[in-house]
Swiss-Prot record:
Propeptide section residues: 21-41
Pfam families reported for this sequence: Toxin_21
Organism of derivation: Calisoga sp.
GO MF: toxin activity
Name of the protein described by the UniProt record: U1-nemetoxin-Csp1a
Lineage: Eukaryota, Metazoa, Ecdysozoa, Arthropoda, Chelicerata
Disulfide bonds: 42-56, 49-60, 55-77, 66-73
Comment, domains: The presence of a 'disulfide through disulfide knot' structurally defines this protein as a knottin.
Keyword flag Calcium: no
Similarity section: Belongs to the neurotoxin 13 (insecticidal toxin ABC) family. 02 (Calisoga) subfamily.
GO cellular component terms attached to this protein's record: extracellular region
Subcellular location: Secreted
């Protein structure tokens, strides 16, 4: 029974991340510039991206930050 509960929680978590990713947009032509406060946080967090295109390109973000959008650097990123 407890494994079933853990399984259900995991399914809900995956669904939440998926729906969060669908709310964003991919910026190809005109990448959205992050506000200066977020840029500073990105640089200090080893992800020196200044816009969403840099972050999504993998130059600064990783799978875990850009695709799951846990990091402020990937705030506007979406998986391609």
């Amino acid at each position: 029974m407890k494994y079933f509960v853990v399984f259900c929680v995991l399914i809900i978590a995956v669904a939440a991340f998926t729906s969060a990713a669908e709310d964003g947009e991919v910026f190809e032509e005109n990448p959205l510039e992050f506000p200066k406060t977020i840029q500073k946080r990105c640089i200090s967090a080893r992800y020196p991206c200044s816009n969403s295109k840099d972050c999504c390109s993998g130059n600064c973000g990783t799978f875990w930050t850009c695709y799951i959008r846990k990091d402020p650097c990937s705030k506007e990123c979406l998986a391609p």
